[in-house]
Amino acid sequence: AAAVLATTSLVCTQAAADARKPNVIIVFVDDLGWTDLGCYGSKFYETPHIDRLAGQSAMFSGAYSSCNVCSPTRASLMTGKYPQRVGFTSYLNPNKPSGANSAATHLPASETTIGEAFQQAGYRNGYIGKWHVGSEEVGMPKQHGFDWQMATAKHGLPASYFFPYKWRKPSTADVPDLEDGKPGDYLTDALTDKGIGFIKDTVSEGKQSFFLILGHYAVHTPIQAPKNLVEKYEAKKKRMYGITPLTMIPERFNRKVPARQQNPTYAAMMEHLDANVGKVVTAFDELGVTKDTIIVFTSDNGGSCMPGSFGSRPTSNFPLRASKGWNYEGGIRIPTFITWPGTISATKISEPVITMDIYPTLLELTGCEQLPKQTVDGRSLVPLIHGEQKTLNRPFLAWWYPHSNGHGTQPCQAILQDSWKLVHYMEQNETELF
């Protein structure tokens, strides 16, 4: 009888393991432009690991961020809603907690976040890196469904990409929880290593699937990278462009954007990011969970092309127009793809999709309960991914940005409908139709 009981228990345990839901990781990159990857057309940056992963994915050529700056897009990912619906209209400024820059200062407790949805479904959830939708006082990842959090600075950028990831004086940009590093360590490496540690711990325990958001601060300012990689791209810049001067493209409000990618330090940051994506994929292979893991790769807004206080312009979004902070394509078009080996076939999808679609898509892919009253604006992309539909039949996409910002734009809204796009500047009462 004991033998029968043991066998039955073993069968039940195996059945439970077989029925376990797939793991999920969202690689959420900061300020990554649509043309910053080789698979999206970059000739200057080198991203072989990301390109290889994208080639195995459902790859979206018409993916948009929910806003042209970070905090609203991040709120949209967490809620499955337009950011303006939950009060996020611009990036948060931790030095002005009264709500300057945005109508909201944190995610409302009434929202069932994507973290809470996966927690309720039995996942072990982790969040590492850039958060920027609240602070210790008003809601960090652990208050929104994540069992484990690490390195979530109050600010939207790190004080430094080099250990100890702090400024000389205490700052809201100081990155916490990474004190066990050493001089010379690089932040993108540290975040990835800690994230892989969370994955290994969860897999070794064997009790739960994992849901992890790996929120890289890269490639946001400050533009910093190891010297040897910077030198590599300085040489590449000379080979590619010689003494040909950089062309600057005029933009509204007396702004200009670069017509080509040529920043060696930014290129070095990109290579570091790429190597770390490769490191995550290798970890999945070594753990034997590759076919049990969904990878979402995306960005929070378009690439930053304006000079600002950190020196030279990080990147160029050409042939897209303008930059992060603008509602033209360069400010809101982003690279996005979803990988699940053995389940999602390699395909390219041109239908316009947006950040808030990720939440309902992952619920459907993992077999978790759909939350239509929560994800009221997002649409599941599963029919597109599996080729069951060519379109979502969505009436339009909309962007609302009632602010000026350091990237040069003015209060602006935009609507995308079919192949038409309308951009309206509120204070100037000027409308453009493309």
Locate each region found by the language model.
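Short, well-structured beta-strand/strand-turn elements
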Residues: 122-134, 366-375
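Active-site-proximal cap/lid insertion segments
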Residues: 29-45, 52, 61, 65-68, ...
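Short active-site alpha-helical segment characteristic of glycosyltransferases
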Residues: 114, 130, 358, 381
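N-terminal export leaders
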Residues: 1-4, 24
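Loop/turn elements at helix/coil->beta-strand transitions in domains of secreted/extracellular proteins
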Residues: 20-25, 56-61, 120-126, 144-147, ...
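Active-site nucleophile/metal-coordination loop of metallo-enzymes that catalyze phosphate/sulfate
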Residues: 65-90
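Bacterial Sec-dependent signal peptides at the C-terminal "C-region" and cleavage site
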Residues: 5-20
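His/Cys-centered metal/cofactor-coordination and adjacent catalytic loops
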Residues: 84-114, 173-174
